[in-house]
Amino acid sequence: GCGNTSIPNPSTMHIGIDRAGTVTLYSGALDIGQGTNTTLVQCAADALGLEMSRFRLVWGDTALTADAGKTSASRQAYISGNAVKLAGEDLRRQIIRLANVGETAAIEFGDGRLVVRDGDAVREIDLAALAPVRFDDVLVGEGMFDPPTTALDADGQGKPYGTYGFAAQMAEIEVDIELGTIKVLRVVAAHDVGKSINPIQVEGQIHGGIAQGMGMALMEEYIP
């Protein structure tokens, strides 16, 4: 809302690998049903070039996770998603540098080691030989994303938010003018979502918005 206008709105994420080869995404983002946990693991897997099943997720534990800000208005997908992407890219750069291979190299996991393949070249990183740098993790990538904004000037012009949502909704209803009852016959929702990370979750979010809108309009006696 207006309280966020032109102020910092960052999220910080960490991805770590321990000596056993466990890959952990540390997320302070709160999933309240919108599917953030799945979406952020998708972002991490894409950034590192790994399968989603490789990741362990630690979330909602303030002793282990950095601040990711509040969960509202699809904020976590945009802001924390970018933070996870940066963390994954940071970790991948560290692995590539240790293995002394090219940027397109593939990362695989052996028994307590990383196997990095770059064409015919194969390098191994012994994880047990590395010292922990954060908790039990011997390799850690960090990403912080804060949407670029500018303060409003005296004329109210500027860029107070990093991105915006665009949508249109139409509802066809039936009204019993004698009883005063309303029946929703059909709702059409059109949303410009940009690049969809998880299309099924996006559709679920739209359905949820429709349900909330119907509730506010018909049942909550809301007076704006």
Each predicted region: which residue ranges?
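Cofactor-binding beta-sheet edge motifs in enzyme active sites
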Residues: 1-224
